[in-house]
Amino acid sequence: MDFSKLPKIRDEDKESTFGYVHGVSGPVVTACDMAGAAMYELVRVGHSELVGEIIRLEGDMATIQVYEETSGVSVGDPVLRTGKPLSVELGPGIMGAIFDGIQRPLSDISSQTQSIYIPRGVNVSALSRDVKWDFTPCKNLRVGSHITGGDIYGIVNENSLIKHKIMLPPRNRGTVTYIAPPGNYDTSDVVLELEFEGIKEKFSMVQVWPVRQVRPVTEKLPANHPLLTGQRVLDALFPCVQGGTTAIPGAFGCGKTVISQSLSKYSNSDVIIYVGCGERGNEMSEVLRDFPELTMEVDGKVESIMKRTALVANTSNMPVAAREASIYTGITLSEYFRDMGYHVSMMADSTSRWAEALREISGRLAEMPADSGYPAYLGARLASFYERAGRVKCLGNPEREGSVSIVGAVSPPGGDFSDPVTSATLGIVQVFWGLDKKLAQRKHFPSVNWLISYSKYMRALDEYYDKHFTEFVPLRTKAKEILQEEEDLAEIVQLVGKASLAETDKITLEVAKLIKDDFLQQNGYTPYDRFCPFYKTVGMLSNMIAFYDMARRAVETTAQSDNKITWSIIREHMGEILYKLSSMKFKDPVKDGEAKIKADYAQLLEDMQNAFRSLED
């Protein structure tokens, strides 16, 4: 939002636009003489003009949550109404930028103040007015054309990855009386003028949108394309869709942040919005340090990942109230890129801190607390946030589809999944990637527990798999069965040892170990394994399940004959094959390429069939 354009206390002539501070309690300020103010209206509090938002009105008293440190505000200080809700600026310049929770650009503030701290009451516009952008109007638009909300009327090449489509704000329409010719313009220049019912309106490349309002769409569509993360355990066993909602709950040190960062690095999304909401500051600085160095290959060209990423940083040492705003800022930015027809992923790390901010404000308002002191409306607030995800048909012309996928990390205290935030989140989201402390302690990463996690998008994706990877669905079912059987056998093994098991059960145990150690486990810090394309995932799983089927068949068919094949015989004769199976993951998709990896896996399958044939003979 352009805070420099908001009214200032010293410029006001009439005292009627002022209220006065009546009481201060942490981030919550009460003000009197506020008759005529609206809910969620922005106000400037005190002589240092702190940004705040009205969250309750009673008579002429307003309760305000202030997004900055309130020390020094005293009773009788002026409170200025702005007449606007908390809004964000949407236009060229968002990609690659880093904002705080109320969309103030941190790099601009730092260059202005020459300090590592944000001063109070700072006035900076969210999108720079000095940068010139190369604007190209759409070919089919000319003076006299009719245009409605959501129509694309121009294109700005923001960078080599993102074509920024300039859209008419959703609530406007009219006849074009002027459209700017191709050329360089800054974000305050008029590029379009419309006339509707005799009233003329001018538009620049920036539109302002209130964060608590959902951006309108033509219709919501069912999701049908997977969100590929590059993590085998997630893509194979618990897939999410583009336009889906996912929760990653886990205790500290389980690797939530690593999973959400690898999602933003390697997923098949066009745009990434990463919201660090109340997490440690050094995690955000790690993102800022790593992302500019990370590259991705697009059409043979190497590009920086930062070009498709926007960061909203609201770390744990920033004021609490702005945490609540940062989630809404992030989702509004995501919806804006969705309306252009892009597939957007939004990472919220972590929604627990957001809920704690709600709890603190609710406590200061003396509202009735519910479970664990959280407000009674916690579930409704979480739902209203997650429901803004989805695949949609965008408003306006030309026709286009976009999607917003939300991945919310949840940090339950002590890893307790019965915590109110976790249980409320699980009631809303469709995919649950549960992280396990025990797996993390065994250094098994990503530490997704394959027994408690689930995805409700399996059915929605069947059509996609049938079309592109026909053999995949039965493989996944089989792998899950093997892992479940292994869990059931684990108790027996602890009591009586492995030796007393049936031969087929021994095979189940060994293949489950193979799947766990060499398929589900993945080292995110190695070049060959930090990202696993889906064809490699399917190829690896297919060979492991083929080995399981052949071994079981060999044992079952020779069980009655004299020369019985047992698991120990198979292991003795197939040392080489087992070694090759467990080293399938070392194939580097970047160096070796798809064709070579597929050929190697097919060769391994052939070697396996020959080895079993010679064993049975």
Swiss-Prot record:
The modification Phosphothreonine is found at T136. GO terms for cellular component: clathrin-coated vesicle membrane; cytosol; lysosome; plasma membrane; transport vesicle; vacuolar proton-transporting V-type ATPase, V1 domain. Phosphorylation at Ser-384 by AMPK down-regulates its enzyme activity. The keyword Transmembrane helix does not apply. CDD domains: ATP-synt_V_A-type_alpha_C, ATP-synt_V_A-type_alpha_N, V_A-ATPase_A. ATP binds at G250, A251, F252, G253, C254, G255, K256, T257. One of its GO terms (biological process) is ATP metabolic process. Its main location: cytoplasm. InterPro entries: ATP-synt_VA_C, ATP-synth_a_Xtn, ATP_synth_asu-like_sf, ATPase_a/bsu_AS, ATPase_F1/V1/A1_a/bsu_N, ATPase_F1/V1/A1_a/bsu_N_sf, ATPase_F1/V1/A1_a/bsu_nucl-bd, ATPase_F1/V1_b/a_C. Keywords: ATP-binding, Cytoplasm, Cytoplasmic vesicle, Hydrogen ion transport, Ion transport, Lysosome, Membrane, Nucleotide-binding, Phosphoprotein, Translocase, Transport. Its EC number is 7.1.2.2. Catalytic subunit of the V1 complex of vacuolar(H+)-ATPase (V-ATPase), a multisubunit enzyme composed of a peripheral complex (V1) that hydrolyzes ATP and a membrane integral complex (V0) that translocates protons. V-ATPase is responsible for acidifying and maintaining the pH of intracellular compartments and in some cell types, is targeted to the plasma membrane, where it is responsible for acidifying the extracellular environment. Belongs to the ATPase alpha/beta chains family. This is V-type proton ATPase catalytic subunit A. It comes from Bos taurus (Bovine).
